Structure formats: C-alpha cells, structure tokens
C-alpha cells in the first residue's frame, strides 16, 4: 500500500457572487499528503484554506464549485466519482472538523445522537459500539463526565467543550484523512494543550493523514510536519515546519510570522477607576436556580479602560458578559452603569442603555441572520438607535466597512459568502454602529488570522484613544491580554481567583497557582514547545487549583 493518501493536482475552485459574476478563489494548487503526516495550511482570511480542506472530500460550499484539477484520494480521483460514492466516503474515510461547532450541531438533538449518526447510518458499527467509541473519545479529549456528557444538548455545554465533541464525532469512524479547520479556536489555553497533544497522538497511533487549517502559527508549530502558506487562493511557499517558521523564503510568509509579534503596548494603570462606566457588585448568577455559575463577583471597568476577563472554558467569563448585557439577571447583587443601577433584565432597560452597552459574540455564525446582507446587518442598529435610513444609512455602512478594512462590495453579500474572519469583522462593525460607551468583546479575535487580528486590535485601540470607549475583553488568548489590557481578572469555576494590573498579573512569580498554570499554557512558536511543556512543566497541569477563600 502506497504511503501517499491524498494528492491534489492543479486544483481550481470558483465562487459565484450575488451579481452572478464568478471569481476564482483557489488557483492551480498542488498538494501531496502521506499517511501519518500533518500538513498545516496557513494564511489570512480568504486565502482559500477551508476551501482546499473541503475540496479534499470533493466538496464545495454553496455558491462555489470545483472547476478544474484532480483530487486523488487513496488512488481514486474523487472528481470522477458519483455523489452516492462520495457520500459513502465522507465522514467515514475522510472527516471534517469545522471551525464553528455551534453552527454544525442540531440544537434539538442530543450530542450522542449526532456523534454516532454517521457510524450507525453507514453500518460501520452498531449503536451500542458507536456510543462506547464516543465515550472513549470524550475521555481522550478531556471532556468532563465522558459517560454522561453525550446525553446533553449542544446548548448545555460550553463552546470549547462543543468543539471537542465535534472532534470526537469526526474520529468515531476512524477515518484515514482528518481535515481540522481551526479545531482549537474556541479552546482555552490549558485545554488547547490537552487537545493538541491528544489529536497529535491519535493521528500518530492511527497513522492518519491530516490537513490542519489554522491562523495560529504557534499552534501549527506543535502539530504540523510541513506547512503550506496560501494567499488569495495560491500557494506562496511550502516546506518543513521549522524552516517555514524560522527561515521563510517569501516576504509574505515573513509578514505572517512577524504579525504574531505585532502588539499594542499596554498602558500601566494600577489604580481602580473612581467613576467606573460599569461596576459589577457582589453578583451571583445561576441558569437553573440551583447551581451558581458566578459567585459574588466584583469587577469595575473605567472609561477608556480595557479589562480582560480570562480563565478556562466554563469558568464563567461569558456568563459574566450575559449578566452585564441583561441576558441573564443575577440571583444576587447588581450591575451599575455610570453610577446608576441597571435593570437586571434586558427588556426593562431603556433604548439608550441598550445602545451604550454593545457585545461582539464569540461565534459570528450564530450572531447574524444568514438571510440578511452585510448592509442590513450593520444598518439595523443605525436605524434602531439613530433613525438612519436610505442613502444616509448606506453611506454610514460603507464608512464602517472601511473602518474594519472591508471593501464596499461586501455590503451586498450574505454571511454564507464570507470567511470566518470576515464574519467576525462584520459583527465588530455592527457593534461600532451603535457608538457605545463599552463593548464587551467575547473572543473577538479568536476566529481571525494573525494579520487581521493585529489590525483589529490596533483598530480597537485607535477607537479607544479617540473616544474613551471601554472594553470588557473576554478571551483565552493570554498573549493578547498581555499586550492590550490595563487590568486583568482571572476566573475559575465562577470565582475570581485574582485581579489587578496586567503588568502585575503577568510578572513572575504569580501569586496564585492557577494563574501560573494559565500563563505557562500559552503556546510558543517553537516546534518543540508542546513536548517541552508536557515533559518539563507537567506538574503545573496536575495542580488542583484552589480558589482562595
């Protein structure tokens, strides 16, 4: 049996726009992938990474089609096969882990039903064996309560947990080819280490071939044997991972590598603000009235200040944002805005309260109406809050698109015609349209490539300096926190472990073991970093972090 599993020859993919015109989005790409090998596909949003990944299964998104070239899988040209043959192959011999797990699960079905569906439907194994296999994978992917988590619905697990469930779903049938499209995007740094190590080990044990699509160069350094750099649907260069990251030949690759070090310098601000924009006072919150997911939280955010909220998946970061925005009334305590108590429930707040507190969500796929154009999505707050219509609204939409570095032609596109990064930028523009006093940024850069993320952070910083807007910045990317936040709040299982100026939090030695664990988990752009962490820093990840009394 040949070691070569996948080969693409002169692959071409075209997309049809709303005006009917076609645009080539992948142009004559050649690719080879052997069994047991991981090829990283990197590049900016719109580079064609996900399109190439889907083409490995002879599949194209709605509005796109493969117009030329060959996709040879285990000796068979998939472009010559009928749709029924391709359906039998997809999910069984080749599996895809999507960038947005939230948009990939049926909210009305339990997780086990969806994870086991392909294996049962294709006759790969019985229902009993499929569930047993799913539970085994849940454990390997470090999901809590692996024996019972499959009986939950998608909304009953965190975003990071749902992403790992999707990884289990892809691996259930033991495919020859795994296509991983940003599989750790939604994961906190400590979970990311565990999942990266597990996925890498499973690939090695099963001799899988894998396409690993990512914009995070530090992540791809830990798992890829080779890297292919893409730009505007064309290959820029390809080579061993260490060579591409440390000695690239092409100027564009050098730009990608340097973009990861692009930072916004932090402003040292130790003192708490005297007149905060938002004050969270003694807040306790619960979804079911029995289990508290937030416990007596006190946080203040001042005018023109960036406060980062960090912690692992399930620590309560996004729940805290829901309390501030009124989506989840607290069981105890309250939130003040500019010194006045805010109504706990969203429906009781004034239109001006709603305008002044905006939120950018973690999952852009579920935050936009798929049937509305970009202009309609951005224009809605312009009409609702300011009464703008017609040409005035259209002009303001174009201005907002320019602020987020998107061409005016995007105004008429639908969300399904955008890349992951483009979708998130539209969500940012929608928040900016309301001209708020504070924006709650929930993983705002997690779906963006390094170059675009750096641009967005600079944009947010520029807006803050010009308008004194405040940011509550929820993230698991501590590299971002270190570079943009004035103060940092560390959370664990609904408690605040510690909070203070970002400089103090990140300057060793850390006061709390849990904070030290988080900081030690930030990936570095070295190919040996993951092995070094697992070998030399293992004691950190065995800590049963206790929240101070």
List where the protein language model places each region.
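Conserved ABC transporter NBD signature motif
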Residues: 65-77, 333-344, 353
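Conserved ABC ATPase "signature" region
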Residues: 77, 129-148, 392-409, 520
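Helix-to-loop junction immediately C-terminal to a conserved catalytic motif
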Residues: 57, 61, 325
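Conserved ABC ATPase signature
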Residues: 152-157, 161, 414-418, 422
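Charged, flexible cofactor/metal-binding loops and thiol motifs
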Residues: 144-147, 241-279, 290, 502-549
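Conserved catalytic motifs of ABC-family nucleotide-binding domains
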Residues: 174, 435
